[in-house]
């Protein structure tokens, strides 16, 4: 069985402060896309955990898929292992949450297959130890996020079609958040103000100065709609009212770029799958 590991986009991203431990306080809105990696799990009688399809440039010990499986195994002691394979579509370092999504899908799938019976809340708490974005993928609903990204409130933004461009570069989140040019004192806004159109990606200006490929993609997509960057990049997106319109824009994409169209989803494809199983 294939388990979806969907992309997310940040509809806006503000930094409202910095905590004493160095983590940034943020406000953002997450929405899922119907565009996913795909994971398969083969349960083993031994406790061995193995990734059959290693990702280029990512060491197994730092891969969030392996780390998530080992984390759940250590927490619940299922006396079983797993062999995992992945078909990768989401770009690494693209701001679409690929690694966090992979971790969440691994936790949810193995909680089911190992019959470890953790609740969604318990899985989300476990996921938070792997990354701030993992809990939103565990819960599986579009969300307003505060704190370091772990304080989630369900929201229901519009679900348009998106054109997503994948520039040929990987953006370092650490580099962006450590930049002296990054604004860290945005005025907090409310959900209603966001839903009425307020909010922007405060990281975008820093990224555009350092990554010409992202700047080029933003400028090109702005010819067709309001282009925005997801997370700390590198991917940029714009929304359109119909699949036909989005497809027409994608067909004009320069040959040296990669891109795709996807539907915005307020329930993740993984959450939809799990609701059908229950």
Residue ranges and their predicted role:
Residues 1-93, 112-121, 148, 166-167:
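ATP-binding N-lobe of GHMP and related small-molecule kinases
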Residues 2-4, 12-28, 116-225, 239-278:
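ATP-dependent small-molecule kinase catalytic core of the GHMP/sugar-kinase superfamily
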Residues 11, 39-41, 65, 99, ...:
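Residue-level signal for inorganic ion chemistry
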Residues 36, 48, 78-81, 159, ...:
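A generic structural signal for alpha->beta connector loops
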Residues 45-58, 106, 128, 193-201:
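Short, basic/glycine-rich phosphate-binding loops at helix/coil junctions
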Residues 47, 91-92, 171, 235-237, ...:
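Short, active-site-adjacent cap segments at secondary-structure transitions
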Residues 70, 105-111, 125-128:
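A broadly conserved amphipathic alpha-helix scaffold signal in soluble, globular proteins
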Residues 85-114, 226-240:
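Glycine/serine-rich anion-binding loops at beta->alpha junctions
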